[in-house]
Design a protein with these regions (language model features):
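Buried hydrophobic packing segments
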Residues: 50, 72, 109-113
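Conserved catalytic/binding loops enriched for acidic/polar residues
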Residues: 105
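Conserved non-catalytic scaffold segment of RNase H-like nuclease domains
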Residues: 1-64, 78-100
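Ser/Thr-centric signal marking residues that sit
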Residues: 5, 9, 69, 108
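A short, structured active-site edge motif that brings together acidic residues
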Residues: 63-73
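Acidic two-metal-ion nuclease catalytic site recognized across multiple nuclease folds
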Residues: 91, 110-126
Length: 126
């Protein structure tokens, strides 16, 4: 892993050495998500990364639609100082203790998505 990624995520090369190769988990992942609309923070980045791994594994790329909570938060909270997942979680009082861990980030993203919907509900009704 690049030093920047290690610093940002606190994920080490040792941690990765115990992980199965992407090619062995991607089929189950693709089956799980099916044609669902995905919700992710900075969704284009995640989809690009996943599609590169799919290509590398000789699998078809995904074409799922996605809702990007980064863009959604920029629209819902234009005056927010930052729009990172961690910053938004802190500003909203959402516990995001284990940042940069897939399961925890997914739960945080879900909470931010629902909060954005709730906070913009009155705007949508106008």
């Amino acid at each position: 892993l690049p030093a920047f990624t290690k610093e940002l995520t606190h994920i080490t090369d040792d941690m990765l050495s115990f992980s199965p190769p992407a090619s062995s988990v991607l089929p189950a992942f693709i089956e799980f998500i099916g044609s669902a609309i995905l919700i992710a923070h900075n969704a284009p980045f995640d989809l690009l990364f996943i599609n590169k791994e799919l290509e590398r594994s000789g699998m078809p790329t995904m074409s799922n639609k996605a809702i990007d909570t980064l863009n959604l938060s920029r629209w819902a909270y234009p005056s927010a100082k930052h729009h990172s997942l961690q910053y938004l979680a802190n500003a909203m009082g959402i516990d995001a203790e284990n940042a940069h861990r897939a399961s925890d980030d997914a739960k945080t993203c879900r909470k931010i998505f629902l909060r954005c919907l709730k906070d913009t509900e009155s705007v949508q009704k106008k």
